[in-house]
Amino acid sequence: MSDSSVREKNDNFRGYRKRGRQELRKIKRSSARTEGGSTETLEDVAEDIDHRSDEDEVSDVDSGDDFDIEDEEGKKEKVYDALLTILKSEHPEPKRRRREADESNKAPAEVGEDEHENTEHGPVDDQLEIENGLLGNHEDDNDDDSSGDEKDIDSEDEQDPFESHFNQVPEKFVDKLSNAFKTKSVKYKSVKGSLSDSESYIYAKPVVIGEEALVESPYRSSSIYSYFLKQRLKVQNGLLDKKTDPLTALQKKLVDPMFQYKDILYEYDSYEKDEDEYRDLYALHVLNHIYKTRDRILKNNQRLQDNPDTEHLDQGFTRPKVLIVVPTREVAYRVVDKIISKSGIDQVDKKGKFYDQFRDDSLPPKSKPKSFQHIFRGNTNDFFVVGLKFTRKAIKLYSNFYQSDIIVCSPLGIQMILENTDKKKRQDDFLSSIELMVIDQLHSIEYQNISHIFTIFDHLNKIPDQQHEADFSRIRMWYINEQAKLFRQTMVFTKYISPAANSLINGRCRNMAGRWKNHKVIGSENSSIGQSGLKIRQIFQRFDIIGNSIIEEPDYRFKFFTSVIIPGIVKSTGYEDGILIYIPDYTDFIRIRNYMKEKTTILFGDINEYSSQRQLNANRSLFQQGRLKVMLYTERLHHYRRYEIKGVKSVVFYKPPNNPEFYNEVVRFIGKNAFLGNTDLNISTVRCIYSKLDGLSLERIVGTKRAAVLSHAQKEIYEFK
C-alpha cells in the first residue's frame, strides 16, 4: 500500500485534511483551572491517582486546544477502526498453525527445582507481577521523556546508520523487497572473511531475484568512534578521547555489524569474560538507539509546535523499541545492571525491589562442572517480564509495558502473555514496534523450551488490535504496511550454534541490512575427543537420509537404531550390562522407550527430566547394581542435574550432544568406573550414531576437518581411540 493511498484513505475517514494532525495528538491536562470551575476529566482523575509523586515532571507531548476528551477519544477510535479495516483487507492475517502440546513442549522449570531454583516469590506472585505490567497505560503520561540535554539532539547525519537504516530507505525499495519475500523471490548474496586463524564470518544480504546488488563486507575500522554515539553515552563510558582504544578483541568483531543494524548470530568461547564483553557492547547500542529515538520525537514535537502542518514520521504503533530475552533472573539482573551503569542516569526507580527479586548470591555445589556453576548460579527463576522506561530524570523499572522503552523477559514469562489460556488476558500489541531484539544465552534457553522463542517471533511487528493512544499522523509507513520486520535488528548470542539458532536467524529474520554470523574452526586437539584423556574405543556410525529429507531424518535415525544398534546390544561381544543410552531429544526418548518395552526383552530402566526424585534414585541404584542392563538417559536431565551415573561400562549416543562438554562428561562415567576396577577400558566402547545434519555438533566433538570427512566420505564407520 503506497504512502499516498493510505493517507488519502485516512483523510477520508477523518473528513478533513491536515487539521487532523493537531487533533490526533495526545491531550494534556491544563496546568490550572479557570475560575469558572471547569469539570475534571477522566484523564485528570487518573493522573491525580497514579502520579502524585511525579507532579514536578513536565510532559514532553505538545498541548492541544481545549476540547471535549470523550468526543476526541471517539474520533480516534473511529479513525483507528477504519485504519484497521483497510490494513486487514490489504494484509489478511494468515491462519495460525495449531501447535500440538505434548510432554516435550513443557517448560523445563520443573526440572531440578528442588536443587537449583531459588525463588522468594511464588508462581502466583510472579504471574500477578507480569500481568500488572499490562495495566494502567496512563501511569506515566506526565513524565518528561527527554533523555538528556537539548544540546545532545541528533544532527540527523545521513551517514549515521540510525538515520540511513530507519529514515532514509526509499519507500519503493521497501515495497519491492517486502513483495519479494511474500512471493519467495528473494535470494541472499554473501561475502566471507577471516576474523582470525581459527574464526571466520559470513555476511549475507537479501536481494530480489533478477536484480544486481553489490554486497560488501560490513567491516570499517572496527572502532566505536566510527559511529554516532549520543554525547551523554560518550561521557558516561569514557569515549571522548579518540586516541584511546576501548574495545576488546571480541567487541571489535561485533561493533561494525551491530552498529550498522545487521542481524547477528554470534558463537562465543568464554562463559564469564565473553558474555560480559558482548553485553557491554549491546547495552551501549541499545541505549544509543533508545536515546536517538526519543530525542527525535522531542525534536519533531518542537517542529510541530512551530509549524503544525508539517509531516514528521518518527513513531511506531507503541512505545517499546527493544526486547531482550534471557533465560533466568540472574542473567536479567546482569543485563539490566549493565544498562543502568552505562546509561548516564543516576536515579533508578524501584531499584531495590528489582535487586530483591532478581539478585541472589547463592552458588551451585563446587563439585559440579564450571559451566554448570555459571549457568545455575544466583536466581534461576525463569518466569518474569520487566519494563524499563527512560525519562529525563530517571530510569523507571517495572514500568507499564506500553510505556516502556525496553522489555526484558524470559521466554516462559512472555509466553504467559502471548499465549495465555485465558483469551481475555492475551496481548501482543506491545511487541508491534520492536526495532531491536536480543536473545542472550540461547544455548541455555534451548534446554528450557525453544518453542517459546519461535512463539515470540510469531507475535513480533504485527498490526496492533487496539489503539494505545497512537498518533497516526506520525507513524512510519513501513509500520502501517506491516514491513517493520524488514527493519528489525535481531542479535543472538550463544555458546554453541545449533540448528535451532540457524533456523531463527535464517528463517525468522528478514532484516534488509542482512545477517552476519561467525564460525569457529575447531582443531582436533581442542575437540572433545582430543581433550577426553581416555584411551577408549569411540566408534562413529553414519546413517544416510534418502532424498535428503530433513523432516524424515528422525525416522531414518530411529530405523537405524532399532535395526543396527539394538541387535548389537542383544548380541554384544562386549559388556552385556552397564550400557547407557544417551538421548538428546525427549520425543526420541519416548519413541525408544516404547519400542524397547514392546519389541524387546532387554531389562532396562530410564531417567528423564520428568522423573520423580524417587524414580531417579531407584533406577540409578538398580543400574549401578547391574539389575538393570540398560539405562536410557536424556540430555535435558543431564543439563539440569549433571548426575554422575555409576556402573557405566559402555555408552551409546543416539545423537551427538549439542554441548561438547556433555560428550566428555558422559564418556568419563566409564573412566570413573574403570578407576574403581569395575570395567576394562579395552572392552568398553563409546558409540555415536549421526547423519550429515549433525555437522555442527560433530565438529565440536571430533574437530572441524574430521567432521567434514565423517559427514561426506563414502566410509560410514570411523573409530577413534
UniProtKB/Swiss-Prot annotation:
Compositionally biased intervals (Basic residues): 15-31
Gene Ontology CC annotations of this record: nucleolus; nucleoplasm; nucleus; small-subunit processome
Lineage per the UniProt record: Eukaryota, Fungi, Dikarya, Ascomycota, Saccharomycotina
Region of interest: Disordered: 1-168
Bias type Acidic residues, positions: 55-72, 140-161
GO molecular function per UniProt: rRNA binding; U3 snoRNA binding
Protein name: U3 small nucleolar RNA-associated protein 25
Function: DEAD-box RNA helicase-like protein required for pre-18S rRNA processing, specifically at sites A0, A1, and A2.
Family membership noted in the UniProt record: Belongs to the UTP25 family.
Modified residues (Phosphoserine): S53, S63, S196
Organism per entry: Saccharomyces cerevisiae (strain ATCC 204508 / S288c)
GO biological process, one term: ribosomal small subunit biogenesis
Gene label: UTP25
Further details from the record: Present with 172 molecules/cell in log phase SD medium.
Entry annotated with the keyword Ribonucleoprotein: yes
Biased composition (Basic and acidic residues): 1-14, 88-105
Keyword field: Nucleus, Phosphoprotein, Ribonucleoprotein, Ribosome biogenesis, rRNA processing
Subcellular location: Nucleus, Nucleolus
Assembly notes: Interacts with snoRNA U3. Interacts with MPP10, NOP19, RRP9, UTP8 and UTP18. Component of the ribosomal small subunit (SSU) processome composed of at least 40 protein subunits and snoRNA U3.
